[in-house]
Amino acid sequence: GGPAPSPAPTVRAGGVNVPFAGAEFSGDAWAWAQQDGLTTLMLADGLGHGLAAARASSAAVEQLYRAPELSPADLLRRLEGALRDTRGAAVAVAQLDVAAGRLLFAGIGNIGARLRTGATWKPLLSRPGIVGAHRAARLPQHEAAWGDDCLLVLHSDGLPSRWSPGPAAHSTSLDPAVIAAVIVRDASSPARPVRDDTTVAVLSPSPPDRLP
């Protein structure tokens, strides 16, 4: 009786991208791709604002879709050539192998990354630089354990680096796009106005009631 139904995904991604001051273009871009049991999440922040910045971040996303099987470090090396004719960008890439319970991470530039395990948050560090401006001599790739109590947040520098995770960021049932939107909302205030394009992308396990 026909092909077997494909299993429900065990991980979800979502995000929000808010252009600075209501601009037509955001210099940020985020995307995710799934292939061969791997889920890869990317966030790119093109240098500056406007269309030229958007072209740089969009070029980064295009490479993710072309080669979703590459490790974070290998994808960033590929981007160094692909972004050479753009302004360049800060880029972070996280790749999740759910079956192995492993998360790989690599980044260049000022993309923030935090991994929650249970109630504990840990920063994932990128190396300084600009993708497309010069080739990185060495590109460290970090490895971390991943389980059903984990959550990954990537964010551009429009979000204050010292933002505090609220209740939404500890939820196991909220859609990741909702979590991202709440993080952006809670991090901005009249005392700390947003001064740049702001993007937050979230990777989370599917809640138990959505699994087969």
What is each PLM-predicted segment?
Residues 1-212:
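Conserved subregion of the PPM/PP2C metallophosphatase catalytic domain
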